[in-house]
């Protein structure tokens, strides 16, 4: 799981184990058709765009946009290796650089919860989709559906006084989610609960990566020197030894994941 480039680690480790299978779920829900123009918002390394491009065919168009240039660089390389014609742009979801009605379909996989202004991002997706077009997105259900991560979050809060994962699971309330989409102008909102099990190789590396990612943005962690950060990491790892063993089957961590897959019309 180790890499000097987090985007490459994401593509090589997280996409095959988690985000690739969930991309298939999202694309099946969206049902892209030949000739359609499709936008993948907060595309990351582009797995959703890569799943869609052959479905819309040579008469269609697929564009991926993300704020992270390192993610986009990996997305471009992956698409080139696979011989896929996808356009990549850098930019924020809250200010999409496209004209009104430029797309038939907008997709967004596990990113809405991270946007600084979720409603603004949805309004932008609404704006760039033509009347009669549609949106499909996925968000994780709440921490109550993810006990391993709830335990990890409790361990992080004990050591650092602040949550490390609650944003990831912040849109589990279906009423809030529906109101958010409707307030952005979408109609006929359908929310489907979907569950899937993921198998992560190398349990020790998996936990180390989760701790690194989930504590990186916490101010109290950032203010520590290297030795103190290592001490916090070791303490959290010790707290998680029993939950990690319980989730380990052979050489893999096996965890259930629960999401809401949303489809709505423009």
Would you name each region that the model predicts?
Residues 3-7, 19, 45-47, 169-266:
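Conserved Class I S-adenosyl-L-methionine
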């Amino acid at each position: 799981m180790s890499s000097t480039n987090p985007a490459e680690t994401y593509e090589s480790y997280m996409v095959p184990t988690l985000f690739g299978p969930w991309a298939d779920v999202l694309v099946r829900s969206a049902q892209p058709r030949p000739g359609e123009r499709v936008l993948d918002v907060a595309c990351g390394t582009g797995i959703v765009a890569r799943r869609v491009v052959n479905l819309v065919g040579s008469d269609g168009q697929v564009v991926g946009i993300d704020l992270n240039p390192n993610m986009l660089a990996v997305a471009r390389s992956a698409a080139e290796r696979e011989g896929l014609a996808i356009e990549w742009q850098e930019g924020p979801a809250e200010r999409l650089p496209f004209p009104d009605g430029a797309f038939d379909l907008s997709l967004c996989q596990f990113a809405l919860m991270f946007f600084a202004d979720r409603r603004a991002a949805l309004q932008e997706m609404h704006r760039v989709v033509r009347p009669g077009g549609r949106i499909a997105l996925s968000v994780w259900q709440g921490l109550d559906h993810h006990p391993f991560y709830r335990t990890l979050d409790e361990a992080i809060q004990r050591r650092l006084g602040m949550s490390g994962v609650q944003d990831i699971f912040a849109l589990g309330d279906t009423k809030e989610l529906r109101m958010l989409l409707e307030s952005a102008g979408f109609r006929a909102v359908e929310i489907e609960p979907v569950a899937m099990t993921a198998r992560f190789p190398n349990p020790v590396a998996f936990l180390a990566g989760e701790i690194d990612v989930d504590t990186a943005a916490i101010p109290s962690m950032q203010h520590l020197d290297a030795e103190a950060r290592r001490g916090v990491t070791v303490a959290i790892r010790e707290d998680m030894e029993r939950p990690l063993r319980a989730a380990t089957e052979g050489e893999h961590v096996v965890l259930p994941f629960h999401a809401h897959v949303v489809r709505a019309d423009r």
